[in-house]
């Protein structure tokens, strides 16, 4: 049976702060920028990219933390000049999810620390516009989780460290499209390892289990 996973969308946000128990993603902590990179799961190649900025103050009460903007290099004037209305970005994301949906699993999205940080922003973005992201996205993957599984010990499990350990360049970090391109390559490297690419398999190991198994009677 052939896999029905044709595409994975690697996604990243830049935000104006960090969520907490008192500050909800998107509703209190503003979205500034989104980027997506689409991976063809048969060829393991990047086949499409998307990025947008959000116009600032898309709702009342948003607080843009200076330290957060300093890290990602964005300014409110940049967001005002290049940003789009949150509703337009929501629609663009929805169309991307629909374009690259898989036959059984719908859209599959992935990122680094994506489950804990990024995806809750998507959930609230869609809910704010009267929609449910789970209508389009069925599976959520996380390269940070894959790193924990793949490596029992390393310096840390940040994106930069994981990329460096896998010989993947990460330039212009903390801008959404740059992080996402490198993260897509990291995801591809993990998938290649899962598929055993580049790993030599002996003829004996390649035999079906029935041929390898030899029943022995205890003496």
Mark where each language-model region is:
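Conserved non-catalytic scaffold segment of RNase H-like nuclease domains
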Residues: 2-123, 164, 168, 174
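Acidic two-metal-ion nuclease catalytic site recognized across multiple nuclease folds
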Residues: 2-3, 165, 181-219
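Residue-level recognition of the N-termini of beta-strands and the immediately preceding loop/turn
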Residues: 105-108, 136-141
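Substrate-recognition/cap helix-loop segment adjacent to the acidic, metal-dependent catalytic center
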Residues: 117-139
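Short alpha-helix plus adjacent loop in nuclease-associated cores
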Residues: 140-154
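A structural motif
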Residues: 151-164
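Active-site metal-coordination segments of metallo-dependent hydrolases
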Residues: 152, 171-177
